[in-house]
Regions:
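Helix-terminus/linker motif at the lipid-water interface of multi-pass membrane proteins
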Residues: 40, 44-62, 131-138, 194-201, ...
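Short runs within selected transmembrane alpha-helices of multi-pass transporters and secretion channels
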Residues: 82, 150-169, 177-188, 206-219, ...
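Transmembrane helical elements of multi-pass membrane transporters/channels
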Residues: 30-49, 150, 184, 213-217, ...
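Transmembrane alpha-helix boundary and packing residues in multipass membrane permease domains
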Residues: 35, 39, 50-51, 68, ...
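Alpha-helical transmembrane segments of multi-pass membrane transport proteins
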Residues: 26, 41-42, 78-79, 119, ...
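Short alpha-helical transmembrane segments in multi-pass integral membrane proteins
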Residues: 1-32, 89-156, 187, 196-253, ...
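Transmembrane alpha-helical segments of integral membrane proteins
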Residues: 382, 408-417
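Small-residue-rich hydrophobic transmembrane alpha-helices
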Residues: 61-121, 158-177, 283-347, 378-397
Length: 452
């Protein structure tokens, strides 16, 4: 045991020297690459689900949009504990306080799994009225129930996977997180068509495949964290106190708000699209998945920056924090410009991949074109939110997280359709992105001034 402890101590010291001493730009690129790959593969398997289910019918495609709200809640809880504990953990590692970092790791993991168990229990007991409340039409609701049932059973593993990926990343070990997520996603590429078409399980088979793959990812991530993390995952270190829980809650609140607001906004989009029929719900569900893929690249870049930010902020190296922030903002904006052009040009073909119904395509293409005009602002918006979260500016980070998906989008998507019909649903996200950009500017000016 003494030898193992010594090895981990040496590993922690080496990681500290890497995070606080290596050139910032290459370091961020090295750390963000596994995160970007993880996000892209996860998005690809979400889109694969959308594609396969789209072959079953328009109502089944709409069910994916309903289920997305529940999945976002699971993500929110996983990110709350994973990012909440991870933010504080990276700062403690920057201060070389490894014992407290180990306790944060254990508390974050245990909290995520327990929250998933709560979601599973509540969801399974109230599933039918829940999907109706989330915007299902009478034709979509049965398929949403079928898809969500196995996913809710696996909710503890889903929440645990999201948390563990973040906890590994904040230790600077994003490659191991990538291995866990990519393994489950690749398995889904095989199981989804097998269950849906070969075993004739339909949309239930798609949900079952996703549940199995999330469980596999959880198992791999748990093993990786125990064997290869800078801090060993051990529930014996799960000794929460008031101050520790306050740190986790403060660090995770922006993630919870960001993902929770995302779930609310998806529900509001479904409710707003409901009067325009199944095609409108299905079209918006497809666009949300496509734009999630585009934004996942930028989220991956920010995830590479966060451990660098946490370590260096904890070590008092503020110039490195600022250098990393501006590098990520510029790179994210350039990437989004390229993606926006590609998505605009190939919008019809992209939507038709998932559903060839002309009504679905019309809604999807219009929404995709509008969102391409403003998606380039998300690099600045996301990097500001992720940096303030890592720096423990909980109030600012929580407010900025709430703006894009909650404070602005939720009311906008319910009001604009009253004036513009289905066009109001299609343009709501873009209006929200512009308002969020304008609000973020003064906050980031102040934060960057304080880092001088």
């Amino acid at each position: 045991m003494v030898q193992i402890h010594g090895i981990r101590r040496a590993s922690a010291d080496a990681k500290y020297r890497q995070m606080t001493g290596q050139p910032v730009k290459p370091l961020i690129l090295k750390l963000c690459l596994p995160a970007v790959i993880s996000n892209l593969v996860t998005t690809a398997y979400n889109l694969t689900d959308t594609f396969f289910i789209g072959q079953l019918g328009t109502a089944q495609s709409g069910a994916i949009g309903i289920a997305f709200s529940i999945m976002t809640v699971m993500q929110a809880l996983g990110f709350f504990f994973g990012n909440g504990a991870g933010n504080s953990m990276s700062r403690e590692l920057g201060k070389q306080n490894n014992e407290r970092a180990s306790r944060l790791l254990a508390v974050g993991f245990a909290g995520a799994v327990l929250s998933g168990l709560v979601i599973a229990t509540i969801g399974l007991l109230t599933l039918r009225p829940l999907v109706v409340m989330l915007g299902s039409t009478s034709t979509i609701a049965p398929y949403a129930v079928q898809y969500l049932t196995p996913l809710l059973v696996a909710a503890p593993c889903v929440c645990g996977s999201f948390a563990l990926n973040g906890l590994l990343r904040y230790q600077g070990q994003s490659t191991f997180g990538m291995i866990g997520l990519v393994s489950g996603a690749l398995l889904n590429f095989l199981l989804a068509p097998l269950f849906i078409f070969v075993l004739h399980l339909g949309i239930f088979g798609a949900g079952l495949a996703t549940a199995i793959c999330q469980t596999v990812s959880f198992t791999i991530l748990t093993t990786m964290s125990r064997k290869f993390g800078v801090m060993k995952l051990s529930l014996r270190n799960c000794r929460p106190d008031v101050l520790l829980m306050r740190e986790v809650a403060g660090g995770g609140l922006p993630s919870l708000i960001r993902q929770g607001a995302g779930s609310i906004s998806v529900t509001c989009v479904n409710i707003a699209a409901n009067p325009f029929g199944d095609a409108a719900i299905a079209g918006m569900a497809i666009v949300m998945r496509i734009m999630l893929g585009a934004n996942s690249v930028i989220v991956g870049l920010g995830q590479g920056f966060q451990p660098v930010c946490g370590y260096n902020y904890g070590a008092g190296l503020f110039a490195r924090v600022k250098e990393g922030y501006w590098f990520c903002v510029r790179l994210a904006t350039c990437v989004l410009v390229v993606l926006a052009v590609l998505l605009w040009v190939f919008a019809p073909q992209l939507v038709e991949i998932f559903r060839s119904d002309p009504a679905v395509v019309a809604v999807g293409v219009a929404a995709l074109h509008i969102q391409c005009c403003t998606v380039i602002l998300n690099g600045f918006n996301m990097m500001g939110n992720m940096m303030t979260q890592t720096m423990d500016r909980t109030g600012i980070a929580s407010f900025l997280a709430l703006c894009r998906q909650g404070l602005f989008l939720a009311p906008i998507v319910l009001i604009l359709p009253m004036m513009f019909g289905v066009l109001g649903v299609e343009m709501a996200q873009s209006v929200s992105d512009v308002l969020t950009f304008l609000v973020t500017i003064p906050f980031m000016r102040r934060i960057l001034h304080e880092l001088r």
